[in-house]
Amino acid sequence: MDNLTKVREYLKSYSRLDQAVGEIDEIEAQRAEKSNYELFQEDGVEEHTKPSYFQAADDSDTESEPEIEDNQGLYAQDPEAEQVEGFIQGPLDDYADEEVDVVFTSDWKPPELESDEHGKTLRLTSPEGLSGEQKSQWLSTIKAVVQSAKYWNLAECTFEASGEGVIMKERQITPDVYKVTPVMNTHPSQSEAVSDVWSLSKTSMTFQPKKASLQPLTISLDELFSSRGEFISVGGDGRMSHKEAILLGLRYKKLYNQARVKYSL
């Protein structure tokens, strides 16, 4: 390392360094290029024949060429393929295409209602091929149908398929008509006079709170239903008691669970 350092220091102080480098480049440019073979001959290296394993490879290539030419007769020639250099046409299929029936199995099962000592169980199998989002939508639909049973009788609903899905309609219930024969010079009792609970639609009913910090709940049928027709359409009946009609309205407005927790219904 010390000698190399000294050489570097000397070259830095050598005043004719650039001139020497230029002369070396000029000599190198004028030197004639020679192949490795010529360099070996200059050094007295004799040229030898190819090794035996190279000759064996050459002999095998020569012998295999006629074989390839003979086998080419077994391949069907494609006129377009002849225009591509180095392309060899492969053997063509000598059988005709056959139609194969493909049957896709399905694991879907129709709804099954089971009964045991714990009660009834309904099993629904979801359709195949649903994405995660589609399966979530399917579950939400089933849940909505089940929850709607609180507000109407599903067994009496009509079922209609549409382009967008399914339409379920409630069967309209015709209210009973009570004939009242008036009696002259008599004053009927309140129970006899009230033949339809809707006649009490403006009468409020009060429910006491379960906690002293809450105010009593006072509500009427008019606040829960816009009309008698709406009351009837969600399962109301003129023969209901006033309290039953109020509770039906709370369920219809989805207030029943909140009221049940806070008030004595």
Curated annotation (Swiss-Prot):
Residue positions, PTM Phosphotyrosine: Y14
PTM comment, free text: Phosphorylated in the N-terminus by host CK2. Phosphorylation of the phosphoprotein is required for the transcriptional function of the P-L complex.
Modified residues (Phosphoserine): S60, S64, S226, S227, S233
Region Interaction with N(0), annotated ranges: 1-60
One of the record's GO cellular component terms: virion component
Residue ranges, annotated region (Disordered): 35-77
Main location per the UniProt record: virion
GO BP terms in the entry: phosphorylation; viral genome replication; viral transcription
Annotated effect of mutating S64A: No effect on viral mRNAs levels and infectivity
Gene Ontology molecular function: RNA folding chaperone; RNA-directed RNA polymerase activity
Region (Interaction with the Nucleoprotein-RNA and template-binding) residue spans: 245-265
Marked site: Involved in oligomerization: W138, T141
The keyword Transit peptide appears for this protein: no
Biased composition (Acidic residues): 58-70
Entry keywords, A to Z: Chaperone, Host cytoplasm, Phosphoprotein, Viral RNA replication, Viral transcription, Virion
Assembly and binders: Homodimer. Interacts with the L polymerase; the association of P and L forms the polymerase complex and positions P optimally for encapsidation of newly synthesized genomes with the nucleoprotein. Interacts (via N-terminus) with N(0). Interacts (via C-terminus) with N in ribonucleocapsid (via C-terminus); this interaction allows to package the L polymerase in the virion and positions the polymerase on the template, since P acts as a bridge between N and L.
Entry note about domains: The N-terminus is disordered and is involved in binding N(0). The region of interaction with the L polymerase is necessary for transcription. The hinge region is highly variable. The central domain is involved in oligomerization. The C-terminus is basic and essential for binding the N-RNA template.
The protein's name in its UniProt record: Phosphoprotein
Gene: P
